[in-house]
Amino acid sequence: MSITNRRFAALAVGLGLVTLPALSACDSSDAAGSGDPKTITLVSHDSFVVSKSVLKDFEKQSGYKVRVLKDGDAGQAVNKAILTKDNPQGDVFFGVDNTLLSRALDNGLFQPYVAKGADLVLPEYRTDQDKHRVTPIDSGDICVNYDKAYFSEHKLKPPQSFDDLVKPAYKDLLVTENASTSSPGLGFLLGSAAHYGDKGWEGYWKKLKANGVKVVDGWEQAYNEEFSGSAGGKKAKGDRPLVVSYASSPPAEVIYADPKPTTAPTGVATGTCFRQVEYAGLLSNAKNAKGGKALLDFMLTKEFQDDMPLNMFVYPVREAAQVPPEFTRYGPPAKDPETLAPEKIAAERDQWVKSWTSLVLK
């Protein structure tokens, strides 16, 4: 998913959670997996994080050694995997989400495999059921977040919907990420397209532009530099009280605060959310397909699924997986998020981004 919050991933290290030792994507010795039948190579985006104890449990139980090749953000990693599919860098790829899934499938990136535990995945996350080329692993919502202190001080009700964001009361308050360079920025664009349809989303963005929306390159700049509520407002540099981020951002604000507040300093505009789902799959031409299948099985176990929320700030997809109380209290998934079929995204994404760029950035 990335959820591509490197800030959250970095802070996780301080909690005793570790990013797995990563190989350089440019190291020629790692260009085509290890070929070692007892080593599994997992290719992923930069934000993949797992508890060391969970990984060790898998290695002890399975007899395999896991190494991780981190290959940039989700889009970069998927593109690299497609380019190297005939001689893949690893055995399993994790981190292709629903915004990029059709591109990966159309390019033959994965081979079929039904992971053990697939029947325990919540129905709304299941996809590619006829060919089983990918396994759902986690989900998350991209949503507008708001700085509670700002709206309290200004006696202004926080926006809750896409329509609210174009009202005069919220002029010059929103910062979002570039849809062509950022996963949350793209998600927000897709959410607006899902909400207003093919003929309505451009008109919406014209109104949003007229209402002073600010566009920056990526999430870190938007959240940590432009948003007034970052780190509970204590370290915020920006003056924008609205930012495109994640439904899991308010829980992170509580979990990483010292001392911990009794309430989250930020909230979520639940009517602006777009649902992301991340998948993993067995790479075509994987050197260690048997080991890759074992790793995919493990990623659907309760142990791995329970471990994800505090590592990557995403929600598990397995039934009865545990979610930290901070998530339930401060950042539950949206009840009715915007969604788009992967096929629709594949057909329209590039043109939407091109039109958005021309409309908003020029």
What does each model-identified segment do?
Residues P21-A25:
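C-terminal motif of bacterial Sec signal peptides marking the signal peptidase cleavage site
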Residues D27-R103, E225, K362:
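Early extracytoplasmic/lumenal segment of secretory-pathway proteins
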Residues P88-F93, Q111-Y146, D163, L173-A179:
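A structural signal for short loop-to-beta-strand junctions that line the ligand-binding cleft
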Residues N98-L109, T127-K157, G185-H195, R275-G281:
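Periplasmic solute-binding protein
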Residues Q111-D119, R133-T135, D163, P241, ...:
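Short beta-strand->loop
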Residues P184, G191-G271:
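Ligand-binding pocket segment of bilobal, Venus flytrap-like solute-binding proteins
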Residues A280-T339:
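Mature extracytoplasmic/periplasmic domains
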